[in-house]
């Protein structure tokens, strides 16, 4: 089931790239914009799910240790406070999207934020570390 879901995003990327190429050759600007939007959606779905699959573990997880644990304590005050903020980000999404813990490479700190839909709307300089799929199918 999951591999079919993810494969649909990859197929969507390939289709959008082919249609985008054709639209550019024809100079069809409306089709260019439509296929750029479709490409962003499907590429976002592929990237988001690629991160998501790596976040999952058959044995569940536990609190982080090492540098990540220290950064969470420093940025959020404690793991429990981080967990509360991350849960609020996930539950506060209106519609479909993702809750994300990311490392801000410019500010050099951890942030939680929401992604709406799939369009890979990760702020510049952010490296996603943890994502939770909050789409209705999840």
Swiss-Prot record:
Reactions accelerated catalytically: 2 superoxide + 2 H(+) = H2O2 + O2
Class of the enzyme per the UniProt entry, highest EC level: oxidoreductase
Cofactor(s) this protein requires: Mn(2+)
Keyword Thylakoid belongs to the record: no
Example of a GO MF term: superoxide dismutase activity
Binding site for Mn(2+): 1, 49, 133, 137
Cofactor binding remark: Binds 1 Mn(2+) ion per subunit.
Highest taxon of the lineage: Bacteria
Transmembrane segments: none
EC number: 1.15.1.1
Annotated InterPro entries: Fe/Mn_Superoxide_Dismutase (IPR050265), Mn/Fe_SOD (IPR001189), Mn/Fe_SOD_C (IPR019832), Mn/Fe_SOD_N (IPR019831), Mn/Fe_SOD_N_sf (IPR036324), SOD_C_sf (IPR036314)
Keywords: Manganese, Metal-binding, Oxidoreductase
Function noted in UniProt: Destroys superoxide anion radicals which are normally produced within the cells and which are toxic to biological systems.
Similarity-based family: Belongs to the iron/manganese superoxide dismutase family.
UniProt-recorded name of the protein: Superoxide dismutase [Mn]
Gene: sodA
């Amino acid at each position: 089931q999951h591999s079919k879901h993810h494969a649909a995003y990859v197929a969507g990327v390939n289709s959008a790239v082919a249609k985008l190429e054709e639209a550019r050759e024809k100079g069809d600007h409306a089709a260019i914009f439509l296929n750029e939007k479709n490409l962003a959606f499907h590429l976002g779905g592929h990237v988001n799910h690629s991160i998501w699959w790596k976040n999952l573990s058959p044995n569940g997880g536990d609190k982080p240790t090492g540098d990540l644990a220290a950064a969470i304590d420093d940025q959020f005050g404690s793991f429990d406070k981080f967990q509360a903020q991350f849960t609020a980000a996930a539950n506060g999404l209106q519609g479909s999207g993702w809750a994300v813990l990311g490392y801000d490479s410019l500010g050099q700190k951890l942030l939680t934020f929401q992604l709406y839909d799939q369009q890979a709307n990760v702020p510049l300089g952010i490296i996603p570390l943890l994502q939770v799929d909050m789409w209705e199918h999840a």
